[in-house]
Structures are given as structure tokens and as C-alpha cells.
Amino acid sequence: MSMPNAAMRYAPEFQVRLQGELVPAALRASISSVNYQTGLEGADRVELSIFNENLRWLDHSLLRLDNDLKISMGYAPDPLRQMFVGEIVALAPTFPASGTPMISVSAQDRRYRMQRGSKTRWFALHTKCLGNFPLPDVAVAGLVSGENGLMPIMDPIGAALSIVIGGVEAAVSFSDPDARQKMIRRQSGESDYDFLRRVSAENGWEMVMDHQGPMGGRRLHFLSMADHLTPEVTLRYGQSLVDFTPRISNVGQVAQVAVNFWVPALNMEFLVAAGWDWDRSALTLDIVPGYGSSLLTAQKDNNKNPVMILNEPLTSETAPRVLVTKLLAKLNNRLTGSGRCVGDPRIQAGTVMRIEGVGQQFGGLYRVTSATHSIDSGGYQTSFEMRKEVWFGSVPLLEQGAVKVDIAGQTLRIGRP
């Protein structure tokens, strides 16, 4: 490859479409920076900074609230990746005493509409003979998504596990009408977004927007972590990874999460505790009579292996699902990190990344929890937040790229053996 072509290959490029059409060349030339943020929480968002010389763009018809906006990023001359599809939600012009006036254009994906208002309702299938039966969470997620004009996408393993667990819960409560009523999903004064976040959390899903393809911005992906363990991006410190700051802490960590619940049929209280076996990389579940709860906590060193007791109104059917959700939230925040690299459009919320050249403890597989892509006069950069999930423990360290840093004499050699 010749030098001119090599330089062109690494020329950052972006494309903006408003109302389905490429913006005029004059408007494109006035855009000073593009900032795109994506995360596992909240709607994805974009901010454009536009030079508003002579106030030429102040009342332009393309810059209106609710107008469709699409952003693509990448490097010329390669095809750009469609990164964002959403709507303009805010306009903020500035009129400085000196200097060039600016306009900031903010857009969010269509999930922001789901955050408006609140609803109170329940999701059940009514039968004449047996009364109300709870709808599976997969169906609930699909119904609420469809009401908001979104197409739900379910990962196979995540959907199957949800259906199996829901089926077990339904079978256990089949002969108990009161138990069936308690299992019915209720949206109690929540927005559709908050309700789906709660349903997703209790099933081990993450909600991310798929911006790719002709249906981009309308495909709501209920991401199952167990379906995505293969790294899509590999970064190496000293090469593609510009900087990296990991953090490991046992502050707030627990060995088990437990809850007490009453079983009327047995006239007895039980304690259910979910834990994590680090040696086997597997979940554990203990069920003991209520009087055994003190024995369970006594078996743990409360300084090294604390047990968190939940104070929530749970039943024998719903307790295991909620316990595992609470436990995983704690475990997956034990080792987190942040980093920065040369702009890479592949880095999105939910992406699995392999970090190399930072030792065994801090190297290996991570899940991206948020990413920011910025293109301005300084070029194209991507910064990200990430977490090391317990599921990655099933992948051998060598395959993860997590190896020790070797020091030979005065030479520091970072890499695989």
C-alpha cells in the first residue's frame, strides 16, 4: 500500500442523515464535532456541535425537534458503520459576546419515548376454568416493545432459560390460585422503560438498541450474557490500547444473597441463599428452614464472606430468580475498568473485548458497559467502561489473553508466553 493510500485508510469519516437524506455539504462542513454515547442503561445519544456563522442554521428546517437523525462513523475509504438511529430531542444555540455562534444538536434513540409517563397494569392470560395465568416474560417483553413501535430481539439461550424457569414456577403454583396471582407480572406506576428494565434484570438480560441495517433504531435487543462470550475486539496495551485503568475491589462484595419467605402449606419459614463458587465457576443455591438461617450465616466468615439478607416480599416461586439477579449484579462489579483507544466502531454496549498486555489478573475478557465515540479536529477516539463478568471464568486464561507480565533482567516483556 502506498503512503497516500495508507494515510487515507486512517482518515476518520462520519456521515449525518436528517429526515432520511444526507445533510447538505455546507451543513456537513459546519459540523465541528460528533459525540456518540451508548450504554447498558438509558437511551443511546448523539451530540453534534455546529458552527452557526451568520446564524445561517438557526431556523433551518432540518434542525427541528423530533426530526429523524442517523450517524455513521468509520474510516475512509472503507464503508462506514451505521452507529445511531434516533430523533432530535434538544437544540441549544449559543450567542457569545465574541467568537462564532454555535448550535448543539442532541438526539436519543427511540427508547427515550418509553421513559415518558407511567402505567399500572398486569399481564395475564384469562381462562374460564382456571382463572388467570401469568404470561411468560418473553411475551411480556414483546408486547411492551411492540406497543412502543419496537421489534424485540431475543437471544436463544436467554429466551429458553426464561421460559424454562417460568414454566417451573407455573408448575409449582398450578394448584394454588393465590400463588398464580402473585406470579403475574404487574407494572405498578412505572414507565414502560423502567418496567422492561426490571423484567430484563430478573431474567439476566440487558436491553440494547440495534442500530444496524434498514430496521436500525427499531430493533430492541434483549441481550443474554450467556449467549455472548466470544470477544469481538482485541486490544493490546502499548499498541491498539492507548490507556487502561482497571479497578478490583471487595468493598460491597458478598458471598451469598439470601431472603426469608413463608410457605403457608407447611406453616414454616424458609431461607433461600444464592452464592457463587469461585473454584467451580458455578452458582450455588441453599434452601434451609427458617431456624437454620442463623446456622447458614454462622458458617460464613462475615468479614471475608458476608451474606446479604434481602428485605423483599418474595415467594418460594420468585425468590430464586430475584436472588440470582441481585447476586450477579454484585459479582459483576468486582472488577471493572475504563480505557481509551483509537476510534473503533465495533466497540458498542454489550461488546465482549479481550484486553492483552496488562497481566493475568487484569487481562482477559471484559464486557463493555458504555462507550463514547468522538470525532473532532483531534481525530477519532473511543473511550469505554467495562466489567469482568463471572461467566468469563469458564474461558481458560490463555484463551482470554490474560497472561503474566514477564520481567527478564532489566527488560519488561509484556505478552503471551
Feature roles, as predicted:
Residues 52, 70-71, 93, 144, ...:
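A structural signal for the main folded, soluble domain(s) of proteins
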